Amino acid sequence: MTVTISQVLRPRGPQIERLTENRAKVVLEPLGRGYAHTLGNALRRVLLSSIPGSAITQVEIDGVLHEYTTVEGLQEDVLEVLLNLKDVAIRIHSGDTATLSLFKQGAGVVTAADIKTDHNVEIINDGHVICHLTKDTTINMRLKVERGFGYQPAVVRRRPDDENRTIGRLILDASFSPVRRVAYVVEAARVEQRTDLDKLIIDIETNGTIDAEEALRTAADILTDQLSVFGDFTHRDRGTVKPASSGVDPVLLRPIDDLELTVRSANCLKAESIYYIGDLIQKTEVELLKTPNLGKKSLTEIKEVLGQRGLGLGVKLENWPPPGVSQYGMLG
């Protein structure tokens, strides 16, 4: 009997359940054995790395020359203010860049709602706290917003001519991705008498600049476009794909020694029970700076090395560590 491509099991349309305003669960079934892991892992990686978004990339603050400047009347240090600015969920409706401003006077909290925008820019989480003024003082900022995708550390985004850039212009690590978290699980599915089938369940959470369903559609379009280049083959060798044993990216299971950090940085991380890349990327910059003997120079090194691999800090991972992993290595 001749088997054609059209006879390969095709899933029904996805079932979408909106869990919160920015989070949704998508169920796709039935799938042939192994297809759920193949599709789930591919979609997860595209969702986290390739969905376009906007982020604040440069900041100028009156009276601030660098990120370690102390500002009188400001409760937070400048470094913490920059970290808070990175979490502002912002959307540019047209164009690739925008310049915004923030001015606040008097004691009190400064939020994203204090950023002055125009009709082309929209701030989603306007209640997000940026800093606190402790006395009757003022803070004046100029913010540059850009569109992009993925995570781009400041050390990677600086151009060679940036040494002559305006004094006081602070370049931020930019997390353009509007997708905050993606997890998938595979369950058994059944169609009539067939029980050797898969069900794919994807849990997606965004920052609100794009809804979860639209993010998934965009990821599927990207994958379709990438795979379309194979459509010109006159002969197709349909080899089998071995299903992944889990939904965890294999890169995250690699030890931090693979990052080739300096001995000092590596030892500081291991002293805090950070043994895998998956352990490391879940830490925030503030948490790492609290690590004994790990200073700003080591933090910069870690961010640069992760950035070269398309990774960043402050990532939320579901079900970590996965089964079979301990702080001493892979379990048999």
UniProtKB/Swiss-Prot annotation:
Reaction(s) catalysed by this chain's protein: RNA(n) + a ribonucleoside 5'-triphosphate = RNA(n+1) + diphosphate
SUPFAM superfamilies cross-referenced by the UniProt entry: C-terminal domain of RNA polymerase alpha subunit, Insert subdomain of RNA polymerase alpha subunit, RBP11-like subunits of RNA polymerase
Keywords, ordered alphabetically: DNA-directed RNA polymerase, Nucleotidyltransferase, Transcription, Transferase
Region (Alpha C-terminal domain (alpha-CTD)) location: 248-332
EC number(s) recorded for this UniProt protein: 2.7.7.6
BP GO annotations: DNA-templated transcription
GO CC, one annotated term: cytoplasm
Single annotated GO MF: DNA-directed RNA polymerase activity
InterPro entries assigned: DNA-dir_RNA_pol_insert, DNA-dir_RNA_pol_RpoA/D/Rpb3, DNA-dir_RpoA, RBP11-like, RNAP_asu_C, RNApol_insert_sf
Chain residue ranges for the region called Alpha N-terminal domain (alpha-NTD): 1-234
Domain comment (free text): The N-terminal domain is essential for RNAP assembly and basal transcription, whereas the C-terminal domain is involved in interaction with transcriptional regulators and with upstream promoter elements.
Similarity remark: Belongs to the RNA polymerase alpha chain family.
Record NCBIfam families: PRK05182.1-2, PRK05182.2-5, rpoA
Subunit field text: Homodimer. The RNAP catalytic core consists of 2 alpha, 1 beta, 1 beta' and 1 omega subunit. When a sigma factor is associated with the core the holoenzyme is formed, which can initiate transcription.
Role of this protein: DNA-dependent RNA polymerase catalyzes the transcription of DNA into RNA using the four ribonucleoside triphosphates as substrates.
Name of the protein in question: DNA-directed RNA polymerase subunit alpha
Organism for this UniProt entry: Xylella fastidiosa (strain M12)
